[in-house]
Amino acid sequence: MVKFDTKLWKAVLMMSMINIGLSVVNVMFKKMIDEGLNRMVATTYRLAVGTLFLIPFAIFLERHNRPKLTGRILCSLFFSALLGTSLVQYFFLIGLEYTSSTFSLAFSNMVPSVTFALALVFRQETLNIKSNVGRAKLLGTMICICGALVLTLYKGTALSREHSTHMETHTRTDSTGAMTQKWAMGSIMLVISIIIWSSWFIVQAKISRVYPCQYTSTTILSFFGVIQSALLSLISERSTSMWVVKDKFQVLALLYSGIVGSGLCYVGMSWCLRQRGAVFTSSFIPLIQVFAAIFSFSFLHEQIYCGSVIGSMVIIVGLYILLWGKSKDKSASVTKQEPLDLDIEGCGTAPKELNSTAHQVSAK
């Protein structure tokens, strides 16, 4: 009789809900940027809303089981914020502005493979190429890279001509050469953002184990992200008028993206990282593209291109070959339990008593 793994399906449901929420955030951000809102100003407001939303949860839900907050933990969270909030948003939003919502999220399908490659480098995963499992992992990773090259180098024809209003507007204002150059630059920015985001999964997975209070850690991470994003905003443009948000849709979108995107979604991902590891958590990221494509096609009237479809299909095939190998890798659970090399003063690995208490905290 097959045993029903409650914790596994709880994590699956959690990541599915997170990806729906993040896909809506992506579509909203695309619309706000197209309307002229500064990309880093939007990120700063989003993180500020998320920080204010999470403070009460961090204070009241984790006041009895919060470990000592040392200087090294704060430094680790500052670095995590740099990877997971400010820098990744900076590069991703440039790519989003220069391409489309659907295309930009097609690149997110690379996250599991890049995360797996980084996990190998940092010894969070193992790879034995002499076994079928090891070869499946390697093959899946290589197929994902090939799919990413298709996305970058081949745009193809539009598959949704009846919904071409959005791209026609850009075509009228930009020459074909300029559009091609912007699309290529956007693709490069998206690749950089994916590498940064994948690195965040590795870093945050370690932090979540030595400091398992996801509300507190996410609140601090968001606060650092506010400071970093504000500085990036001031470096790129110093006009005070860019901080004024008058449009009602933009206000509502910033509130939603802060509460859901930077608040609940990051808390949920921190919980899943601690429970299931970086590769499992990142493997659900391709779902964002599916939901975002539906929302973008319906509300933003974006084109869907042949290259995006082919590249995405190749990446997804590679992804699930990788996941098959991951699921068959019996040593994965042993690897996750190995001592962490993240040297955080006063913590080390999280005590058993702390972990058992932290499991009671809801990630909702």
From Swiss-Prot:
InterPro entries: EamA_dom, WAT1-related. GO terms for cellular component: membrane. One of its GO terms (molecular function) is transmembrane transporter activity. It is a multi-pass membrane protein. The chain crosses the membrane at residues 9-29, 41-61, 76-96, 102-122, 138-158, 183-203, 215-235, 251-271, 277-297, 304-324. Keywords: Membrane, Repeat, Transmembrane, Transmembrane helix. It is found in: Membrane. Belongs to the drug/metabolite transporter (DMT) superfamily. Plant drug/metabolite exporter (P-DME) (TC 2.A.7.4) family. This is WAT1-related protein At3g30340.
